[in-house]
UniProtKB/Swiss-Prot annotation:
InterPro entries: Aminoacid_DH-like_N_sf (IPR046346), NAD(P)-bd_dom_sf (IPR036291), SDH_C (IPR041121), Shikimate_DH (IPR011342), Shikimate_DH-bd_N (IPR013708), Shikimate_DH_fam (IPR022893). HAMAP family: Shikimate_DH_AroE. This is Shikimate dehydrogenase (NADP(+)). The gene is aroE. One of its GO terms (biological process) is chorismate biosynthetic process. Homodimer. Its EC number is 1.1.1.25. The active site is at 72 (proton acceptor).
Amino acid sequence: MSNSQSKKIFGLIGKHVDYSWSPLIHNTGFEALGLPCVYTIFNIPSPEMIGDALKGSRALGIAGFSVTIPYKKTVVPFLDELSPEALSIGAVNTIVNDNGRLLGYNTDIDGFAAPLLPMAESIRNRPVCIFGNGGAALAAVEAFRLRFNPSSVLLVVRDTQKAEDMLEEYAYRDLVTIHAGREIDQPACSKLIRDCRVLVNATPVGTAGRNDHIHSILPTGHGLLHDGQIVYDMVYNPPETPLLAEARAAGATVIAGIEMLIAQAARAFSIWTGQELPVDLVRKTVLAAIEKSEG
């Protein structure tokens, strides 16, 4: 058997995910630790093909997957068991093939929480605010509930009905209040946001190559950013987003999206291999690759 044939195969399930940094992250870790593993990309064109893809993975002995949008919920019915975190929000981003049984995990929750943990005491019993109503926002809601015990979670969204639908089966719905983004101009809503200990951007606004701007969801002129806040942007490319630049200028503590990207990958890496991802090396490698891609 050749060396390539003896390697465990891991991969990313998604749609149009050739841009992903996940192969670089995991292959850097595998190589650094001398593990006989390789990570690749599995572009799946439609949700109707997910069941066949996972069935085939059992037969082929693929060791595990990462799962990204739009399939984090789609994969759930085809798995044999879910972790408590995955069950709580009905979404999976990590799969392990355990001798033909497919086990689903959600590492977005711990990945989101990781860079906030050193500031946990300052978050407890304080309100927090999340912009967005997709899976990333729900993972952030659950991370706050499980790890930080905030007094409340303010969800600021463009589509309030979509947010209501997302939270319909969430067991801790009473923790969350929903506001439409257009309400930010109203003094009462502005005050709620200013009083939040943490502000999170869980939308793709600010991502390199997009035409929109953070001011489309967080208008200026309301003093919403200040030095008593932690501002967390899940966008990781560019590493310093417009939101983070404005928050830094306002004196806020900032957390870049690359920290969540690497932390959730590190948790998946540990689930798959039982070893710790060399986080410092991976961060340096990914930042260098992002800088090169921008050049």
